[in-house]
Amino acid sequence: MSSHIQIFDTTLRDGEQTPGVNFTFDERLRIALQLEKWGVDVIEAGFPASSTGSFKSVQAIAQTLTTTAVCGLARCKKSDIDAVYEATKDAAKPVVHVFIATSPIHLEHKLKMSQEDVLASIKEHVTYAKQLFDVVQFSPEDATRTELPFLVKCVQTAVDAGATVINIPDTVGYSYHDEYAHIFKTLTESVTSSNEIIYSAHCHDDLGMAVSNSLAAIEGGARRIEGTVNGIGERAGNAALEEVALALYVRNDHYGAQTALNLEETKKTSDLISRYAGIRVPRNKAIVGQNAFSHESGIHQDGVLKHRETYEIMTPQLVGVSTTELPLGKLSGKHAFSEKLKALGYNIDKEAQIDLFKQFKTIADKKKSVSDRDIHAIIQGSEHEHQALYKLETLQLQYVSSGLQSAVVVVKDKEGHIYQDSSIGTGSIVAIYNAVDRIFQKETELIDYRINSVTEGTDAQAEVHVNLLIEGKTVNGFGIDHDILQASCKAYVEAHAKFAAENVEKVGN
């Protein structure tokens, strides 16, 4: 019988530390709901003491989820712990995650504390947290660069003070398989408690070993894995939870352990995070990449056609990838479109389907066939526009002279107010973005601009992601359209709209 491995998702906390990623309030809530649908055991919803926005997001998630534990991060500070309590007190299963650094380099250069000071702080703050929470998780930050005897003391101190979950973070992705497994084995054998203690692994991917080390931790006695969807996170990212889960599923013969994830929701969860983070999943990404179930070699194709298991160790359907796609066309009606939405796992009311069907017909008139990926793109684009405080209404371009272009942009807010401005630039994109900047009356820096095609072919829809720096804050925008310039403008407007929404601003004019 397989043992249960808990999944602790930190996409909304550690994942959001990815450069250029800044989820909006609505996006955080939608992500949390999808993570609950995916079946994660715990969601680290944020760091409530860090900002008002983080506090409100954690609070909303705690008040919304019904089955998943909601966790907030806290330093060894009573004010941090109080903030987590206030944010999560309405959760079905509130959890506080208390941490302090323990490695020599952190003690000397960051904390300016002795080992005795750290042990005293752990005892004081875990004890305090236990007065407010039934479940307290403790993490010795930079554990893998901490002397093992001192690490044992830190963990024993936390357990004695009431912690029942101990997380061992490989904060800078420094450890390797055998070493990390040994740390867990040592702790499980050395630390004593009358309570059941769950050991948790938290790995970063700086040396490309986050998933491998997470699996090694299970071999060493860990019963919880922490990570993010698609492996997003600061620097090289975190352990990709979908990879950990499928490794346990496929190699259950070795690990003898399983998660409780609804694996068929894996691809949908990955796509949602990719879209909101503005980070495209690499085509060759394990489990959820576009090429994960593709076979180019003739020998491989022949083998798969004869028997799929010759070159596939798991089925696409297992993770929610459809392989029985029946494209729609310009003659497809509302019923066929509605049935396609159901087949793709969408539960959309009839009123919303009317607008989506109009968008579908517009694309169908321009393409020979409309694929499932096109349908996903239509819905994704519609969701973004529906959530946005402002959206693109019209865009007009005109050639001026000497290589200059003129752009007239019209934006509409949720109340129906119209904002219009124009500008010129050395090319269409520059002209468009100058005009949008004028509408929102903000000076911006374009950090990143990426175009991807939703499908193959010259008639494919364009998917544009932008990252902007506005008043020292990074925001991302996303736009989909059959026209690249329209998609580019939508993405830029969305980035501005996100900034305005987070800062409760109204545009000028």
From Swiss-Prot:
- Keyword Disulfide bond appears in the UniProt entry: no
Annotated spans, Regulatory domain: 391-509
SMART domains per record: LeuA_dimer
* GO molecular function terms noted in the UniProt entry: 2-isopropylmalate synthase activity; acetyl-CoA C-acetyltransferase activity; manganese ion binding
Q: Where in the cell is it found?
A: Cytoplasm
Which cofactor(s) does the record list? Mn(2+)
Q: Which reaction does it catalyse?
A: 3-methyl-2-oxobutanoate + acetyl-CoA + H2O = (2S)-2-isopropylmalate + CoA + H(+)
Could you tell me which residue ranges the Pyruvate carboxyltransferase domain spans?
A: 5-267
Keywords per UniProt: Amino-acid biosynthesis, Branched-chain amino acid biosynthesis, Cytoplasm, Leucine biosynthesis, Manganese, Metal-binding, Transferase
Question: GO CC annotation: what is one?
Answer: cytoplasm
* Segment forming the signal sequence: none
> Briefly, what is this protein's role?
Catalyzes the condensation of the acetyl group of acetyl-CoA with 3-methyl-2-oxobutanoate (2-ketoisovalerate) to form 3-carboxy-3-hydroxy-4-methylpentanoate (2-isopropylmalate).
* Recorded family membership: Belongs to the alpha-IPM synthase/homocitrate synthase family. LeuA type 1 subfamily.
Protein name stated in the entry: 2-isopropylmalate synthase
From what organism does this protein derive? Staphylococcus aureus (strain JH9)
